[in-house]
């Protein structure tokens, strides 16, 4: 039995998220069906980060086991031929049998993309959040300082979150402006359900001047979801990277745009 790693890109608009669901199409279901056909056996995959409905990925990492004798090209080109246009395998490699894309991961990186312009863009409308009011990046980055380190993020988890603990360790949280785009890059060991989108919703209030940077600290310490702002929309969020002890994968979405 061999263990294979796949680097996946997908556009999440047409899916209920990564995880297989009985009532709606999922990225996992589409991938497993295509892999199973190439392998001529049932294939189940594990992913580094389960994205929600409408969320995208430029570098999702999955692994699966198979005893099917197939060249690496079959796992990429063959499977890609069976996948829909909004899901594609970028790379494939054989890895140690102990490798697990979820549990071996050290940290994960997400980008949230904001199109900050007076006029909306027909081209980017489905790829990023449009905000027509000017955002104060400096204040947003001041607020981000309060998010670093291992903390209780109860104020930024959804009511449906099933995690056993609200504690997460954030190593990086930063807004970067590139032209009309503003990119929120966040790196952490793991994230709670809707955590990043809830953070973005609150940080936008700071950027628009409705709250001070220190307000984020107050919300964090409250450990109460009702004290934070509304959840930012899903279509601006991208899973862009994973770091493992021996290698890492990262494809920042803004570098694909610009």
UniProtKB/Swiss-Prot annotation:
The keyword Isomerase applies. The active site is at residue 52. It is an enzyme of class 5 (isomerase). It catalyses: uridine(38/39/40) in tRNA = pseudouridine(38/39/40) in tRNA. The keyword Metal-binding does not apply. It holds the Pfam family PseudoU_synth_1. Substrate binds at residue 110. Its EC number is 5.4.99.12. GO terms for molecular function: RNA binding; tRNA pseudouridine(38-40) synthase activity. Coiled coil: none annotated. Keywords: Isomerase, tRNA processing. GO terms for biological process: tRNA pseudouridine synthesis. Gene3D superfamilies: Pseudouridine synthase I, catalytic domain, C-terminal subdomain, Pseudouridine synthase I, catalytic domain, N-terminal subdomain. Formation of pseudouridine at positions 38, 39 and 40 in the anticodon stem and loop of transfer RNAs. HAMAP family: TruA. Homodimer. Belongs to the tRNA pseudouridine synthase TruA family. This is tRNA pseudouridine synthase A. The lineage of its organism: Bacteria, Pseudomonadati, Pseudomonadota, Gammaproteobacteria, Thiotrichales.
């Amino acid at each position: 039995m061999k263990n294979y790693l796949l680097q996946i890109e997908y556009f999440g608009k047409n899916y209920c998220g990564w995880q297989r669901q009985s009532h709606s199409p999922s990225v996992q279901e589409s991938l497993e069906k295509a892999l199973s056909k190439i392998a001529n056996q049932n294939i189940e995959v594990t992913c580094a980060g389960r994205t929600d409905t409408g969320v995208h990925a430029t570098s999702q990492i999955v692994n699966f086991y198979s005893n099917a004798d197939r060249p690496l090209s079959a796992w990429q080109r063959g499977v890609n031929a069976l996948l829909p246009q909004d899901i594609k395998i970028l790379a494939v490699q054989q890895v140690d049998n102990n490798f697990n894309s979820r549990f071996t991961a050290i940290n994960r990186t997400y980008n949230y993309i904001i199109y900050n312009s007076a006029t909306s863009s027909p081209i980017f409308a489905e790829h990023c959040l449009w905000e027509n009011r000017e955002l104060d990046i400096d204040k947003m980055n001041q607020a981000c300082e309060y998010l670093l380190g291992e903390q209780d993020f109860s104020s930024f988890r959804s009511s449906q979150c099933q995690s056993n603990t609200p504690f997460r360790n954030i190593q990086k949280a930063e807004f970067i402006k590139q032209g009309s785009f503003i990119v929120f890059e966040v790196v952490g060991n793991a994230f709670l359900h809707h955590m990043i989108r809830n953070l973005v919703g609150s940080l936008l209030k700071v950027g628009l001047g409705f709250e001070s940077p220190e307000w984020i600290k107050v919300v964090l310490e409250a450990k109460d979801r009702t004290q934070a702002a509304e959840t930012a929309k899903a279509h601006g969020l991208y899973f862009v990277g994973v770091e493992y002890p021996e290698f890492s994968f990262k494809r920042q979405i803004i570098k694909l745009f610009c």
